[in-house]
Structure formats: structure tokens, C-alpha cells
Amino acid sequence: MAAAKWLIASLAFASSGLAFTPEDFISAPRRGEAIPDPKGELAVFHVSKYNFDKKDRPSGWNLLNLKNGDISVLTTDSDISEITWLGDGTKIVYVNGTDSVKGGVGIWISDAKNFGNAYKAGSVNGAFSGLKLAKSGDKINFVGYGQSTTKGDLYNEAAAKEAVSSARIYDSLFVRHWDTYVGTQFNAVFSGALTKSGDKYSFDGKLKNLVHPVKYAESPYPPFGGSGDYDLSSDGKTVAFMSKAPELPKANLTTTYIFVVPHDGSRVAEPINKRNGPRTPQGIEGASSSPVFSPDGKRIAYLQMATKNYESDRRVIHIAEVGSNKPVQRIASNWDRSPEVVKWSSDGRTLYVTAEDHATGKLFTLPADARDSHKPAVVKHDGSVSSFYFVGSSKSVLISGNSLWSNALFQVATPGRPNRKLFYANEHDPELKGLGPNDIEPLWVDGARTKIHSWIVKPTGFDKNKVYPLAFLIHGGPQGSWGDSWSTRWNPRVWADQGYVVVAPNPTGSTGFGQKLTDDITNDWGGAPYKDLVKIWEHVRDHIKYIDTDNGIAAGASFGGFMVNWIQGHDLGRKFKALVSHDGTFVGSSKIGTDELFFIEHDFNGTFFEARQNYDRWDCSKPELVAKWSTPQLVIHNDFDFRLSVAEGVGLFNVLQEKGIPSRFLNFPDETHWVTKPENSLVWHQQVLGWINKWSGINKSNPKSIKLSDCPIEVVDHEAHSYFDY
């Protein structure tokens, strides 16, 4: 039992004199969403914790008592990939990755109050996840997803024949997407059933591919699609799933349909919102998401954007009647926020939605028949919402969330009432000890066109009478934001606790502040956003006495990496002691090498060959900009980043080196646009924080701060001189 204690809280990690170290950050327990049982008494959630000594991440499943917040261990079996409630008291269904079928998984059934008596219902001949279940007569129908072969069978990688050649041949896009070369396999939703005999259920191994009959359809859609891309009606008879429009080029357009199909696959799936279809509202042809059946199964709510090539357009709630030819209805269509998830109340009269609002992921409610002018009401909760589930048949919801100061917040929220706290990780995990909301505050500054929001993040033990170097962190996207949420990659608090005050701006292009601010970055990447950042920096310099801008640094990833490269060639670049650019674009024309062409074609108002001047306008490699470079810069780029080729980072480093500017190149051959592997993440932090600490003077003022020499990886240096001797 002692070995499982970290599953309940965590074991203390031996840290340095710094309050919140990269080791603390990486090794802190990570908890998944809490899913309540049908009665609203218990919730189950996944938890894992990285162990630096053993170089592994054991995981397991916990139970959360929804009355008092107590947590208990359900199982420490790391092979269990998911658990869901069977719908019958405290009985559960889980997927076990070790199975008698090579490359397959086992479906097991147990009871949350007596887990040891689990039994195997059957096997699935391939990787399979995302279970959703519903009773249908004497059976329990389910859906989940896996990869499909071109024939429609569930793909089993372990059983696949080895190809005679490594060649890849393409006649259409995508060639590669995010971090993967696209192959002939594709994601598909499969249906099956658990049959009851006596007091046990069994599965015969038979699955029906509901997506394959629609040529060129795919669901869930990669790289981030999951179980939220499909739903099963409460009677288990009908399935809804999301797929990109099969007839349109997927790399160029974002148009997405919601398909409806019988659970048994007796008919081919049909879209309810086909572009220019008789039911689809006029002019609505963008990305769809979050399909969910009403409790009676007669309606489907989903979200959809209007623009066909814009991934950051505003989502609007839509409701369609199942099996009807009536036009799809738009709900609260004038609301200037972009909902992300929608669910029905148990009586089908109210919709609960999450949406980003002023840098916080909030929960809202609105009537299911709300007029266009209706403004949804906020449900009180702490931090940002990651997911939510109804507690029994009540109006209360169990929220799984996080914030800038805690990586897990479990709470119960009820419209019109204060939230009820169940478990906040920063109050339990030793690694997060000392983190709290008091060190976080918003900052509003007049920007290029409107007021711009930023977060100020202070270090542990902050003293307003002392002065701290500025860490100016620029988010990616560009249509994204620094939210009141926990990041497992770029975490402002880790930076702050090296001895900085972090300012994390949300300039033009950011989401959650109204669609106009998001849209205004179009064809203006280095325009208004750069001016916003200059104004924020000037405000900090002139008005916040405890921030030292003379010894500040700037860093960013993706669009933030581009902006750091842009800053290097402009006046603001001379205001920083050091720069860090992670996966940022360098040469304007290289953007054509990206995967999702709709992104660049929207943001630069045309194709690469028709609007070349727009791509060149924001080219960081222009000779007149490169001539101004002088600030020491760390460049990071990874081999499996197929959004922005690693050649971008190498080219940037080449120029920095040839100009004699102190610089370093950090590369992970096994990472993507993000760095996610624990040991790589530690090296990333050692290099990034060591770099900025060297140039900002933190290494001198705080001997316990991270130094470049703390990283055990040997540096490749074949030159007779070293910039690091300067």
C-alpha cells in the first residue's frame, strides 16, 4: 500500500532552495478528468507521476468522494488506459492494454467498490479507446474509436505485414500532419455491444465501422480529435460523429460535417449540416465540433464556425432535430465568445457550455431555445474548466479544471450558488506547495488599437520592495492566449521562481476577448501585435517599480517564436539581455512547407503564389532586419515539427553564428512542435532557464538558480573560440 500513496496525494520531491523547480514541475502528479457515477456519489480519474530516479511514469486510477472530497486508490495497474461507468450503480468498464490478442486490448468489467472481482468481457483485435455506452434493451451498446484499414477493418499494428519498401507515395494532401507522415490508415468510430447472460456481460469481438462507408471521411479527426468528436444517443440506437467534409481538400479548408448513423450501421452515415445543404444556415461552412444528443435523443447540439478556411473563427451553438428535414437552429448567435464544449441538462431545457472569456475558461448556461441576442450566464467556479459532468440528475456539475497556480482543481458548481471545493492539488502535493492565486494578477494596458490584457506572475516569497528582472513570455497561435490555466510545457510559475516577474501578454490575435481582437491579426503578424508588446513593455518599465526591464529577457514558442525573431530585428530587441525562440518561423517564404495550408492562406489573405507579398511582409530574414540583430539568442527546433520545419531553426542559428552573436541551438530529434518527454523537458528547462539566467544576471544574484552547466548533455562545439567565454 505504501507504494501507492502518491496516487492519493504524492511523495515529497527533494528540491533545491528554489521554491518551484523544473523537477517539481515535471514530477508533480498529473490527474485526468473526474467522471462521476450515475448516482453522483463517486468519480473516477486517472493519475500518473514521473519518477526521475527510475525513469518511468507509473499510473493508476483513483476514486473521488463527491460528498467530502476524499480520495482513495481504485487500482495501480498502469496497463488500464481508460475507465467509464457501466450505468448500473458503481459498476465500471475498463480497457486493459495487455491482452491475449497480440496488439489488441481487453474489455473488462468490475465494481468500483470491489475492483478485485473484475472479469474479462472480451477482446478487441486492435488499439481501441474512447468508450461511450448506453443501454439498449437487454444489451449495452457502445462506441469507441481506433484506426481503420482501407477495407474498413480495425487496424492492428502488431499484426500488420511489414512493407517491402519504406517508400511513401502521395497524389493528394496531407503528406504529413503535425508530427506524422499520413498513411493509408485513418481514424474511425466503431460500434459494438455487451450482451448480458446471468449477472455478467460478454463481448463477441465484433465491431462495425460507422465511418468507412463514407469515402474520405475520418473521425475523430487528427491530431487532437478524441471521444468529444462523437456521441451515442441515450437509447443506444443512434451515433453522431464529426468529420471533415469528404468532398473537399482537407489541407486547404476547415469545413466539417456532423454525420448521423444507426448504431448497427444499417444505413450509411449522412451529414446534417452539409455545405449549402437544405438544413444548413446560409453562409455557415466552417469547422464543426462537439456533437451531443439531447437526453431524449431527438436533437443534436453542436458547434460550428462560419468561415471555411479559418480555424479560429467564432463558434456558434447549433441544434438539429434528428430524422427531420427542419432547418438547423442557431442559438445565442450574437454572443461574442467562442464556445468549446456543449452539453444538455437532464431535462433537455438548458445548455451548459464552456468558453474562454478574458483569459479564463468559464462555464456558462443558457436556454436551449435562446434567442440570438441572449447572453449566457456564468456559473461560479475557480480557475479554468477542462471538463465537466453532471452530478446525478441534478443541475450541479463536477468540474475538472486547473489554473496558473494549480494543475488540478476538482469542484462542484451549481448555477446561482457558490462553488464547492473538493480537491485542489496545490493544497495537497508537496511539489506544488506555496503556489496560490495571490501571486497572480491581471494587467491592462492601452495597446495599438484597444486595451490589451496580460498576466503578471510573481515568484514565491515575492517582496514588492525588491526588484526582479522581467521575463516577457509571448504565446503561440497566434490565435491563442495566456489563460488562467496550467501548462505542462511553458509554465510561467517555473520561470518566475528562478527570480523573475513574468509578464505574459495577450496581444492582438489573442482569443477570449471578442472575435475582433482575434481577427485583427490577419495579415498583420508583425504589426499591431508587435506594437501591443512595445506598449506593454513601456508600461511595465514606466509604472511597475518592482520589475527590472534593463535586465529582462523575452521568449516565445510557435507564433511567439516568430515574434521573438521579429523583435530581434526591431528596436524592442535591443531592450532585452537575451532572447529564446522555440519553433518559430524565420524565412517568410518557408511557410509553404507547413501542413495545414488553410492556416497560412487565411492569415496571409491568399495562397503562397497569389499573395506572395503578404508572406514576404512579415519575413524575419529580411537583410535590413538582420542588420539590427545583436541580442544573445537561444534557438530551439525539433525534427518532428512538421508545422514549421527544423530547417527554420537551423537557418536562424546559421545567421546568428555568422554574425558573431552569442547563440545556441537546441534540438530534440524525437520531439514535435512541443517537448513532452520528461527527460527532454528537464533538459529543455535547464537550457532555456540557464540561458536567460546567464544573460539577465540571475546566476550572479541567485547562486541556486539553474545554470547552463547543470545540464548533463555534452555541447557540440568544433570552433576554436566560444561565445560563452565573453
From Swiss-Prot:
Where does the protein end up?
Secreted
Q: Which gene encodes it?
A: DPP5
Q: Where is the signal peptide?
A: 1-19
- Which leading EC class covers this enzyme? hydrolase
Task: Write out the GO cellular component annotations.
Answer: extracellular region
User: What is the designated name of this protein?
Assistant: Dipeptidyl-peptidase 5
Q: Which family does it belong to?
A: Belongs to the peptidase S9C family.
Which InterPro entries has this protein been placed in?
6-blade_b-propeller_TolB-like, AB_hydrolase_fold, PD40, Peptidase_S9_cat
Protein role: Extracellular dipeptidyl-peptidase which removes N-terminal dipeptides sequentially from polypeptides having unsubstituted N-termini. Contributes to pathogenicity.
